[in-house]
């Protein structure tokens, strides 16, 4: 009887180690899928630790099969105890916060292909161009040009977040303004930022700049461009805002991706880094005709590529991606999401790139040089309010908010924290968002900003 028990025990221990080995291999495969397929290798730095961990576990459990029975027994006990402890901790946080944010909670949005809309406009003899992010410099007549605006005076096919396609007519420099705004002898206020400043995804009358105009009789120019991070925003300031020298500039910082995806990509461009020299300038405001030609030519190349894509395959892939994202959200607890985030919060020493402070300092100095004032507007992402885990556990450390605001304060910038100053008093801030802000979100923020225009704060 004792021999049978011992044999069963040994078999259980060996089977457990093999199971741990298989799980380690699955972690490696999952890491490869997320890093190399889902993110196409763009986030190696983030996932390298999971590669190392999974490879270590595979080698360790594989080697342990040759260890003594006693060692294997202790290994199984310790491993199971660790797993049970971690998942007990994880389920506590899961039950407390229910940190899932799945796309099935959103109203399903049917988006027409921007190319299809472009083709429809073409049939009506309306010149248009789908909005797309400019991520590279162009060579024109042996001169390098890096545009930071769009094509001028053209119907721009922009975005759709609430089953309503948003298009706008760009101004003489490719921004989202009525062109006549540039004819004013004096421009009082300029907005600089990404898609939130640009007005995604609402009609012209509901953007930040439009709402702010309703509250004052001042001239306001919107220089927001989707996809811009801090360095490109510095370029916009120097190339366009400096030309009009407004009294006030509202610099919009979006916590969702300004310091990660956007700034990291911008700092990889040797050309854009030339703007760290205060005197460097392309004089883009004088080159709009060239910019138009370059962007239209580049778009035609992109359009040829998209037309060669099988539409049914694209829809299938989009559906697959949506379902996969829902699956990831619904299985966060299996991947110890809360445990990993708490460890990251307490262990991670990753600092804010010092170039960010340099950019803000350069921006402030340039605005001060013509007697203007720079306002730093901190915009919170929707996830901050969807997931109470972030508020309870991370607090002001979420997205390094406190450190970012400390940098702005250290430069004596006027800081407007939309999270604390506005949304804190609102019961359900998520009601103010589609993916970007909705009409109500833009309105409540612009009402607050209008107070700074009138010097009420």
Residue ranges and their predicted role:
Residues 69-94:
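Internal/C-terminal transmembrane anchor helices
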Residues 4-20:
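N-terminal membrane topogenic signal
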Residues 98-214, 340, 421-432:
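Membrane/wall-proximal cationic-aromatic binding patches
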Residues 433-457:
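Histidine-centered active-site loop/cap adjacent to the catalytic His
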Residues 198-279:
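Conserved SGNH/GDSL esterase-like catalytic core that processes O-acyl groups on lipids
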Residues 19-44, 254-405, 413, 418-426:
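Serine-dependent acyl-ester chemistry module
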Residues 43-57:
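Alpha-helical transmembrane segments of polytopic membrane proteins
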Residues 27-31, 57-68:
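Alpha-helical transmembrane segments
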């Amino acid at each position: 009887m004792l021999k049978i028990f011992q044999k069963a025990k040994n078999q259980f221990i060996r089977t457990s180690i093999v199971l741990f080995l298989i799980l380690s291999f699955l972690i490696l495969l999952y890491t490869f899928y997320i890093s190399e397929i889902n993110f196409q290798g763009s986030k190696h730095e983030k996932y390298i630790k999971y590669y190392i961990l999974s490879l270590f576990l595979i080698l360790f459990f594989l080697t342990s099969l040759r260890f003594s029975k006693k060692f294997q027994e202790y290994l199984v006990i310790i491993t199971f105890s660790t797993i049970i402890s971690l998942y007990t901790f994880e389920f506590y946080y899961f039950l407390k916060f229910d940190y899932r944010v799945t796309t099935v909670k959103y109203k399903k949005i049917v988006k027409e292909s921007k190319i299809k809309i472009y083709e429809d406009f073409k049939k009506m003899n309306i010149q248009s161009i789908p909005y797309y992010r400019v991520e590279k410099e162009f060579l024109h007549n042996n001169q390098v040009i890096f545009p930071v605006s769009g094509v001028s005076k053209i119907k721009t096919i922009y975005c759709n977040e609430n089953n309503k396609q948003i298009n706008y007519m760009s101004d003489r420099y490719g921004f989202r303004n009525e062109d006549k705004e540039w004819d004013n002898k004096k421009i009082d206020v300029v907005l600089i930022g990404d898609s939130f400043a640009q007005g995604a995804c609402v009609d012209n009358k509901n953007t930040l700049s439009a709402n702010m105009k309703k509250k004052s009789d001042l001239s306001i120019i919107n220089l927001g461009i989707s996809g811009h991070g801090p360095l490109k925003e510095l370029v916009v300031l120097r190339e366009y805002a400096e030309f009009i020298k407004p009294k006030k500039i509202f610099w919009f910082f979006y916590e969702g991706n300004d310091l990660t995806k956007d700034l990291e990509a911008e700092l990889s461009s040797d050309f854009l880094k030339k703007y760290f020299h205060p005197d460097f300038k392309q004089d883009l405001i004088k080159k709009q005709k060239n910019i138009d030609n370059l962007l239209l030519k580049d778009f035609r190349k992109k359009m040829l590529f998209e037309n060669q894509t099988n539409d049914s395959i694209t829809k299938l892939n989009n559906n697959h991606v949506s379902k996969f994202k829902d699956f990831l959200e619904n299985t966060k607890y299996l991947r110890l999401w809360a445990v990993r985030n708490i460890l990251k919060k307490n262990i991670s020493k990753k600092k804010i790139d010092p170039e960010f402070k340099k950019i803000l300092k350069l921006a402030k100095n340039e605005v001060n040089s013509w007697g203007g004032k720079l306002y730093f507007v901190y915009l919170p992402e929707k996830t901050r309010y969807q997931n109470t885990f972030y508020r309870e556990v991370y607090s002001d450390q979420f997205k390094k908010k406190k450190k970012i605001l400390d940098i702005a304060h250290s430069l004596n910038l006027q800081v407007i924290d939309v999270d604390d100053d506005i949304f804190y008093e609102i019961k359900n801030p998520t009601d103010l968002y589609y993916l970007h802000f909705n009409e109500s979100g833009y309105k409540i923020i612009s009402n607050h900003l209008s107070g700074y225009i009138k010097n009420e704060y």
